[in-house]
Structure formats: structure tokens, C-alpha cells
Amino acid sequence: MSGNTLGTLFTVTTFGESHGPAIGCVIDGCPPGMALTEADVQLELDRRKPGTSRHVTQRQEPDQVEILSGVFEGVTTGAPIALLIRNTDQRSKDYGNIAETFRPGHADYTYWQKYGVRDYRGGGRSSARLTAPVVGAGAIAKKWLRERFGVEVRGYMSALGEIEIPFVDWSHVRENPFFAPNADIVPQLEGYMDALRKDGDSIGARIDVVASGVPVGWGEPLFDRLDADIAHAMMGINAVKGVEIGAGFASVAQRGSVHGDELTPDGFVGNHAGGVLGGISTGQDITVSIAIKPTSSIRTPRRSITRAGEPAVVETFGRHDPCVGIRATPIAESMLALVLIDHALRHRAQCGDVSSATPRIAARAPDAQ
């Protein structure tokens, strides 16, 4: 099985399965000399881990990270960093009823057709459990970006099903299990999820991620554009079915006189481009939005087929998130951070000595809309 590595200079290769003994990743290309402890990584993993509220899977995994290599006396050495997270709360018996059938909406059918074998326990390699090591790697990327460039990567839930969540303040995000930027709407979200769980159904979500402080110049046109790599990484998150950069699909209805972000000596007047022009960062906030589909594992009976091609009815009894989007915010943040650190290192390698006589304008002009 290929396709397990993300990045060019800063690479992350994940390993493991949902119900195996452990999951983890190997990070290659991390710059030496950065202070790093397991506690730095654990902070991010705790934001993603399961069992944190009644609205997510009740699988109780501590997600305690172990750093096996690449750090000596609390400092990165430049050698590969191996992160290990042991699985402790597998309940494989919950999946016995799907050993011979395919769950609608899951990777069961495609994995079987492609590889001729599949680990049906919790989805095996295709499980969202594998986003834990991604978040671990993202914690390292975030730390380096923050300390080296002052870059901050933050995200929030902007919609749960048909409920739009107006942005109020970043401080609200860390105060509720939905990562909602509006505390007043949390009771409505809780009632919505309680009703959904009673129905045995699931729902999708939209997550917005913003990277602030990114310098101008990151990105490698034509085929390694910064926004292309962001979209590639975001689509690597389980259940993501759509990615927008900046205005995204709303650009279709905008006129050029509106969409084109004007430049003034005082800065950019708008940011419909989402901080990327020609595949290269502009110095503005990089804004990304992802659409997450409803969880495929639901208690509602669904039609399917067996491995022999016979008709079957599938009802899933495992412990699942009724909305995987609830825990997706730190995952999306990590993916964006991993792309940014990779492009930061690539830019430094090729263009670190380049200078321009044209002044770099502010990310936002005083009269910006």
C-alpha cells in the first residue's frame, strides 16, 4: 500500500490500524535545534482524542504519545522523529457482523476490490483513528512555524448540518467541545446532536482554518502551488468531500471588480484569494474551508451486499462519532501546518537569499472591507 507519506522536505509517514496494537508516524526533515517534549505534542492530541463529550465516540483512548527518536536532551536533532500512540480500547467484537459485508459509504468495498483483503475492525487503515499521528506531527509543525515566523494556525466549526455558526471570537473556540466560535449557539448544537443520536443517524459539518502571519513567497508553481498542496492535504482527511480557499465556490457569482483584491501602498483591500495568488502566499491570512460528510457508520439499517455479491442489510453497532466534524478542527489545523512548514523549508532552500526592491505591503489596508 503506497500513498502513506505527505510532504517533500518535511515529510510525515503514518502507520498502523484502528484496532492494531499502535498507530504512529515518522517525521523526516524537521529542523534541528528546536526544543521539543512529549508534552508539546500531547497538548494537541488531547484536543482531538475520543471520548471527550457525549457528542463523540465513546471509545476511551488516552492517545498518550511517545517520542522514540529524533530528540536528544529535549531538542530536535534533525534525525527522523518517530511518534507512537498505543491503542488501548479496541472492541473488535463490535465488527463481527460486517466481516462478510460492506458498509455503505465506507472504504470497505473499495479496499476489498483493490487489495483483495481488508481489516474490517473499525475500518483498519481507513479509520479516522489514523488522524491522531497527523495531529501529533502537526503539533511539531505548529511549534516551529510559531517560533520561527510567528505563524499561528487556528480553526473552528462554522456549520453543523444546516446550523450556521456565526463567528464571534476565537476565545469561544476552546471553551466548548464543538470548537464553535460562538458560545451562545452551543446549547442548540447539543440539542441537535442529542436528537440525531436518538435517531441513529449522523450529520456533516464545515470547518474553517486560518493561518495568520505567513510571509509572502511560500509556494512552488505550477504543480506544487501552495493552495494545491493545501487542498491535497485536506482531502487526505477522512470524510472530507470539499475544500475551498478564500471565497471558494462563491467566486462563481462574484464579478472581477469585486473578487480581485486591490493593492494599495497601505495594504490589500480584500482577501477573496484566501492569501494565495498564483500558488504563492501573499502575506495575508490563508483561509481554508472544508466540507465533512456525515459519518457512514450509523445504526439505521442500510442495504448492501456480501463479499459473494448477495444482498444484505447492514446495521453498525460500533462506537462512532455521529458527526466526525466535531473533532476535525485540530486535524484540519495540523494538515495546514504540515503544508506550511514544508513550503517554508522549500522556499528557504531555493529562494532564501532573494530580495526585492518593491516594499512588502500590509496584509490588510486600513480601509479594507
Swiss-Prot record:
Classification via InterPro entries: Chorismate_synth, Chorismate_synth_AroC_sf, Chorismate_synthase_CS
GO BP field: amino acid biosynthetic process; aromatic amino acid family biosynthetic process; chorismate biosynthetic process
GO (cellular component) term, any one: cytosol
Disulphides: none
NCBIfam families recorded: aroC, PRK05382.1
Protein purpose: This reaction introduces a second double bond into the aromatic ring system.
Protein name: Chorismate synthase
Organism: Burkholderia pseudomallei (strain K96243)
